[in-house]
Amino acid sequence: MNDRKQSRYFVRAGEVPAYHPARHTGTVNRRLIGDHVGARHVEVVLGVIEKGQGALPHSHPGIEQVCYMLEGRARAEVGGEACDLGPGDCCFFPADMPHVFTVLSEEPARVLVIYSPPYAENADKRRDVL
């Protein structure tokens, strides 16, 4: 990819604006793939989460979510089950199902997150669990 030319199909994570997702603590996300590249049915996000931080209880009505661990360790909780995850592990959060994700490692966790259909950090597509 030519560094001086913008492309609709190729994305460099360092060039994507960061944001702090709702119902998460100590988390910085970068939306790598979404409608800005023409994706209509999938969204891919790179998340970096600090130790002891992560996703508070919430669900995504009508949206499935997959988390793939790149670095660090975290505990995922969904459907009454919990599992500690490390690099190369992944978890699935079904649509409408409350879930929690908490980093256990000293170093930040880097997580590739996939949503289908796209979530686009839309509050109308999230259900907080209090």
Region roles according to the model:
Residues 29-31, 45-60:
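Conserved short histidine dyad/triad with adjacent acidic residue
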Residues 37-40, 49-53, 73, 82, ...:
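Short, charged/polar surface micro-motifs in flexible loops or helix N-caps
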Residues 46, 92, 107-122:
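A short hydrophobic beta-strand segment most commonly corresponding to one strand
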Residues 51-52, 88, 96, 106:
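Tight coil/turn sites that cap or link beta-strands
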Residues 56-58, 76-77, 93, 99-106:
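Short beta-strand His + acidic residue motifs that chelate non-heme Fe in jelly-roll/DSBH
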